[in-house]
Amino acid sequence: MNCREIIRKLLLNPAHNNAATRTAQGDNGDSNQRAYTRISRLAAFQSAQTQESTPKTNGTGRATTEGLTEAEVRWLVMESRALFMSQPMLVEIAAPVRICGDVHGQYTDLLRLFDLGGFPPDANYIFLGDYVDRGDQSLETICLLLAYKLSFPETFFLLRGNHECSSINRIYGFFDECKRRYSVRLWKQFTDTFNCMPVAGLVEGRILCMHGGLSPELTDLDQIRRILRPTDVPDSGLICDLLWSDPSTNMESNWSENDRGVSWTFSESVVKSFNKKFDLDLICRAHQVVDAGYEFFAARQLVTVFSAPNYCDEFDNAGAFMCVDENLMCSFVQIEPTRTLLRYFF
């Protein structure tokens, strides 16, 4: 088993190609988003590695283009666990890099994101968590991301979100998808891998990234580095806050109980004081739907990035990702919402 074959199957599956040659249409019927086609994904795959065009078999005689076997997914999950354990809890990331927010099983939109930002290794990425649940293609989404992580371990980074936790994804869709398409055993192995994922990233020492936000317990970045793994997400404390907390403008104090029932909300002054103390330019986090796909807070010292357009098929939000260049200048690329949401499976 190898990542080349898994990526090939995820990007070039004939069932994907038939659907992906269509162009997403906006509310006015005009094409308002680049088509994501078999040709673009074929070029992306070939730019990453050489792969013979003849389909291989998996030992049972079944062509691998039909989909990933449970053994292949299990291999991908276990290899990723070992890689996560070999890297720190606070990963150090070099610019340039694209920073992406929640994806939530919206696999088609993940391909749109790569179509706009460049498929690895043509661009470097850090994703801020919440790969599974809510969307109907969590398995495609997490498998492609893990395959890219294994293929490009020093330029492709995946942080843990609050949905990379068994108590959450047991309820919001990922457990049911694993059980229906593979097995409960595989879901448990995903859980073991999620428990080893890093929870924060630092871009060139100036941009701190996490899924949720700050914590009243965070007084030294070495606290993150010293977190032991594997670990579940506790109900309170540093890990919980990094994955669950939110900024808020409606604050009578610096910290207040979060309406989610978990963790805290924090004020603008908390962000400004934190950035000054640690000599940071920006905090980049995800975790909340924002209409434009990105939204600033605290005089542009914190930004929320959300990369799942038309979230849950219930919102008209755009998705977005942030591009950080070599000089740490930041810009944003939007993934426009569409009424025509394409879905295809491996």
Curated annotation (Swiss-Prot):
Extra remark beyond the main annotation: Trypanosoma brucei contains two PP1 genes which are highly similar.
One of the Pfam families matching this protein, by short name: Metallophos
PROSITE patterns per UniProt: SER_THR_PHOSPHATASE
Keywords: Hydrolase, Manganese, Metal-binding, Protein phosphatase
Keyword ATP-binding set for record: no
Leading EC class: hydrolase
Organism whose genome encodes this protein: Trypanosoma brucei brucei
Binding-site list for Mn(2+) 2: D130, N162, H211, H287
GO molecular function, one term: metal ion binding
Name of the protein: Serine/threonine-protein phosphatase PP1(5.9)
Homology family: Belongs to the PPP phosphatase family. PP-1 subfamily.
Any Gene Ontology CC annotation: cytoplasm
Catalyzed reaction equations: O-phospho-L-seryl-[protein] + H2O = L-seryl-[protein] + phosphate; O-phospho-L-threonyl-[protein] + H2O = L-threonyl-[protein] + phosphate
Cofactor-binding details, from the entry: Binds 2 manganese ions per subunit.
